[in-house]
């Protein structure tokens, strides 16, 4: 990644690389990057992602330029071409979670939802485009959420300000999830994650308990396949 940054700096006059020197905090990193940006649209993108189609960014921008849209998320795939992200549903796991995890890239999903561009309550920030106007209106990302749920929180803030959050299935990337940072498998990481759960619930408990407006209450919250609630 860092070698690529140097290659970008050397080969493109219109590219400027800034370096964040602090410890890992996804919200702080993106707030730092946004403060250095000059454009009207920001692309938040993990370093463990890989484009499938070179037109992905242009595709997302097409939706993000609409006046009523504040955020656009992509369809993200594991290395085996199964779905890692196709939108986020409030209430999964008691907080929020990705829709259609593990389904085939070519699966249509519940009523074609994997393949249809649509509004969601949230999308992942592993690949998220957002308007500068929206980002600044809500004060950027919440820095108390260093790793988990900062994207969900940001999407809910933007929606509260009146913008839509759109999932775009035609913007596809591979996401080698947690390849760069590892999993939440140590006592310290588990404690931090549980703390971030509490922060999310302290901010959005009412919305989560009321149910996701883009999810049928007759469907289960126990897994991501949109099957009937038991």
Roles of regions detected by a PLM:
Residues 1-23:
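Acidic donor-binding segment of Leloir-type glycosyltransferases
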Residues 20, 45-47:
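Catalytic metal- and UDP-sugar-binding loop of GT-A-like glycosyltransferases, i.e.
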Residues 21-29, 34-37, 51-52, 147-148:
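A short, glycine-/small-residue-rich helix N-cap motif at loop->alpha-helix starts
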């Amino acid at each position: 990644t860092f070698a690529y940054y140097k290659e970008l700096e050397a080969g493109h006059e219109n590219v400027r690389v800034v370096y964040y020197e602090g410890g890992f905090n996804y919200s702080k990193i993106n707030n730092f990057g946004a403060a250095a940006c000059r454009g009207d649209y920001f692309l938040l993108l993990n370093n463990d992602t890989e484009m499938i189609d070179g037109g992905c960014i242009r595709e997302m921008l097409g939706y993000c330029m609409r006046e009523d849209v504040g955020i656009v998320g992509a369809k993200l795939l594991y290395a085996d071409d199964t779905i890692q992200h196709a939108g986020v549903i409030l209430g999964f796991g008691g907080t929020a979670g990705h829709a259609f995890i593990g389904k085939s890239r070519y699966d249509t999903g519940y009523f074609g939802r994997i393949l249809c561009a649509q509004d969601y309550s949230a999308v992942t920030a592993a690949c998220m485009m957002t308007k500068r106007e929206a980002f600044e209106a809500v004060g950027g990302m919440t820095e108390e959420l260093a790793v988990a749920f900062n994207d969900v929180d940001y999407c809910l803030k933007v929606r509260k300000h009146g913008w839509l959050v759109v999932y775009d299935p035609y913007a596809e990337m591979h996401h080698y999830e947690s390849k760069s940072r590892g999993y939440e498998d140590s006592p310290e990481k588990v404690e931090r994650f549980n703390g971030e759960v509490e922060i999310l619930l302290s901010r959005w408990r009412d919305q989560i308990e009321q149910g996701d407006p883009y999810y049928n209450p007759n469907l289960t919250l126990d897994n991501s396949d949109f099957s009937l609630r038991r």
